[in-house]
Amino acid sequence: MRGFTMLAAGAALIAFCSPATAASFVVDAASNSSGAGFGLNTGLTYFAGDLLTVSAAADDLWSAGLLPRWSNANGLIGDLFATGTDETGLPAGTQIGANWGLWAQFGLSAPYGSLVGGIGGVYQLLGTSFSGPAWASGTLELFYWDENSFDNSGRISVNVGGAVPEPASWAMMLGGFGLVGGALRSRRKLAVSFG
């Protein structure tokens, strides 16, 4: 009976602990443009102060229109040249990106073509790498930062994570240690004889 109680307690502990958040998303420069107003709803909910990590590959490109408007998630912040193997399909050395300045929208000024996150109506530049506290409470949305969407193309893969380890993970680990300790303590001692 005691073993069943320990098993039930362990199952309840696991059921009430939430795992760390980690997921991958594809953000489209046209359909998720801030100019169109439709960010990608990740379905991930954060509270202000929760650890939020976001990353995108530096060689994953998207475009704000005619050349030179290709960039990675950091946006159109400087000269960028084709590698010959990137998404543009252009010969190596062709200028594909340049500094286009900042676009101001929703109370945030960020580079054109950058990856921006929105939580609870508050916006933050994420770029290729962000790690810090969530700036508001709500569901995370991801945007391609631009004033319009009609000439945008391309998409990038974005990895989003949360606090690791979370307090729930620690609680689950400590609960597991307690269950193992309780199970070992209740075992009967075996008499060993030699001879």
Summary of predicted features, one role per range:
Residues 23-163:
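Mature extracellular "passenger" or substrate-interacting domains of secreted, surface-exposed proteins
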Residues 1-24, 160-184:
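Short, threonine-centered small-residue motifs that mark membrane-proximal processing/anchoring sites
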Residues 182-195:
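C-terminal membrane-anchoring or membrane-association module
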